[in-house]
């Protein structure tokens, strides 16, 4: 078949990628129109024609269109076809086109010689590692496996950019042999003389340095090797490699995570780490991913200066479950400050009483049961690197149970009002047990306020030198929590309905299932017999 304008003859061949039910049933391909064209050209072993140069202009293969920009050439070709009466109609259609992230211009494919790292032949090894890593959360394992399974080319690692790690190669001007320096020293071949005198192949002495740079992931992909002193301190490396954890965002699973696994496995024959901790995106109020190019990113520095790191950290930990996108809102970040104020005021109340040891009463056993549940669930969250669980579990416990119910229940007893010394000491002991454990659970998330309270109440040694609490004995009383909350709410509402202050007495019968807590309930609510 003869192609108009250029008058070239092209073969028509059968291929399964052409769909008879779609359009004319024929598919036109060119050397480098898109990725599908490239694959078909390689498969069919066709002779390429390079029509666009590195400046984005048409080459001599474009005939009379040589020198025009790509869009200019397209417009001129349409015009010429119309003049030849070969155009049936012109219409605008929408289709998927890869565009540059920064300039938003369509991407044109140009063949160039580059360096590659082999990855196709390593796919089975990479899949084995992807299946063996412990993902947090598990759902993101699929992203890595899907990416590895979809790999169809090796990894191009050289780039024609200015700011990146230089490719450390000098080429012999005589035979074009690539000559490398000894490892260990950073070199800039495009501006420095080679650290050798002659070509290793032909012995000539004239060289030209490579002007290209590496893909940024070439550096990042060996970060586990750098921190474990690979090839610099063998004893240290053997003790620390593989590392424990790779924390990162989900959008760079196919780059940073994949290339790290690829290169570290190639160099060491081992996975680079045991755990992959994958977080979501920070998104704006409309749910769009934050980025500099979109102009919707929020500078965290003013927020940190205004609210402090603890508030920011607690918001980040408690906003969404691990792996999910999180909506960035200064209102929500500031709102976390209410809880930190609650924590501070609770600690201030507890600080009124000495640290003692005493056997707990029933009310104390109940809150210690609830505390044990918080400790257990929080430690499970930490074990899974999911800070959302301890952040919210501790927050809910202090806000909804410990402060409004337990502290109010034992306040009279803690002050020694109409209670014996042993009962009062039991309240003191339990208050401090709860406070200590809650501070320890929160310390990794809010390191500053917890350390401040800890040093004020318990020890001049930092809280960050302590160990996590252990789950205590189960008194089998946490099942009564809903009943306590329900009864307290009932009394508060009754007083409100009757126009009474919370300090006023009221006559309400205590349910049988709460009789174990009668003394504290009567003291709390001023219940009349």
State each model region's role:
Residues 37-46, 225, 229-230, 261:
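Short active-site loop/helix that positions an aromatic residue
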Residues 240-251:
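A short glycine/serine-rich beta->alpha loop
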Residues 258-266:
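Short Ser/Thr-interspersed hydrophobic loop/turn segments at strand-loop and sheet-helix junctions
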Residues 8, 17, 22-175, 204, ...:
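Residue patterns forming the tRNA-binding/recognition surfaces of aminoacyl-tRNA synthetases
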Residues 143, 150-218, 222, 266-309, ...:
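Feature 926 captures the class I aminoacyl-tRNA synthetase adenylation module centered on the KMSKS loop
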Residues 5-13, 211-241, 400, 404-407:
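Active-site-adjacent "gating/activation" loops or surface patches in catalytic cores
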Residues 1, 101-105, 221:
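Active-site cores of enzymes that catalyze phosphoryl transfer or operate on phosphate-rich substrates
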Residues 98-103, 250, 280-284:
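Short, conserved secondary-structure transition motifs
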């Amino acid at each position: 078949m003869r192609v108009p304008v250029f008058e070239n003859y092209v073969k028509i061949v059968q291929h399964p990628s052409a769909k008879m039910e779609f359009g004319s049933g024929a598919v036109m391909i060119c050397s480098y129109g898109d990725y599908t064209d490239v694959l078909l050209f390689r498969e069919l072993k066709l002779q390429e024609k390079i029509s666009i140069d590195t400046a984005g202009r048409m080459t001599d293969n474009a005939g009379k269109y040589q020198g025009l920009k790509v869009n200019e050439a397209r417009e001129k070709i349409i015009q010429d076809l119309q003049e030849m009466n070969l155009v049936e109609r012109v219409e605008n259609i929408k289709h998927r086109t890869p565009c540059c992230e920064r300039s938003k211009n369509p991407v044109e494919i140009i063949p160039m010689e580059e360096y590659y790292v082999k990855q196709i032949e390593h796919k089975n090894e990479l899949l084995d590692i992807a299946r063996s890593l412990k993902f947090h959360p598990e759902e993101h394992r699929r992203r890595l496996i899907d990416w590895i399974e979809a790999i169809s080319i090796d990894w191009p690692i050289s780039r024609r950019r200015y700011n990146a790690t230089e490719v450390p190669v000098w080429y012999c001007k005589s035979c074009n042999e690539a000559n490398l320096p000894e490892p260990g020293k950073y070199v800039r071949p495009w501006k420095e003389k080679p650290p050798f005198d002659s070509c290793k192949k032909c012995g000539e002495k004239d060289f030209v340095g490579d002007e290209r740079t590496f893909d940024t992931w070439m550096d990042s992909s060996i970060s586990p090797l750098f921190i474990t002193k690979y090839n610099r301190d063998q004893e240290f490396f053997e003790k620390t490699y593989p590392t424990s954890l790779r924390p990162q965002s989900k959008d760079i699973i196919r780059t940073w995570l994949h290339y790290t696994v690829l290169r570290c496995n190639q160099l060491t024959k081992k996975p680079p780490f045991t755990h992959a901790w994958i977080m979501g995106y920070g998104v704006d109020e409309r749910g769009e991913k934050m980025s500099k190019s979109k102009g919707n990113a929020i500078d965290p520095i003013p927020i940190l200066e205004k609210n402090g790191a603890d508030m920011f950290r607690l918001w980040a930990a408690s906003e969404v479950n691990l792996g999910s996108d999180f909506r960035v809102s200064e209102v929500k970040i500031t709102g976390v400050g209410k809880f930190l104020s609650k924590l501070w005021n609770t600690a201030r109340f507890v600080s009124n009483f000495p640290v003692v040891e005493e056997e707990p009463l029933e009310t104390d056993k109940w809150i210690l049961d609830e505390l044990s549940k918080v400790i257990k669930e929080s430690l499970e969250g930490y074990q899974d690197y999911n800070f959302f669980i301890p952040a919210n579990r501790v927050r809910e416990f202090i806000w909804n149970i410990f402060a409004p119910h337990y502290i109010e229940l034992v306040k009279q007893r803690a002050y020694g009002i109409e209670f014996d010394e042993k009962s009062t000491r039991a309240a003191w002991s339990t208050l401090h047990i709860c406070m200590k454990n809650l501070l320890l659970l929160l310390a990794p998330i809010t390191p500053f306020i917890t350390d401040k309270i800890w040093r004020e109440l318990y020890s001049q040694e930092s809280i960050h030198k302590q160990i996590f609490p252990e789950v205590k004995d189960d008194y089998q009383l946490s099942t009564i929590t809903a009943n306590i909350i329900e009864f307290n709410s009932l009394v508060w509402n009754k007083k409100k309905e009757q126009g009474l202050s919370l300090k006023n007495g009221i006559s309400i019968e205590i349910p049988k299932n709460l009789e174990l807590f009668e003394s504290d309930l009567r003291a709390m609510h001023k219940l009349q017999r």
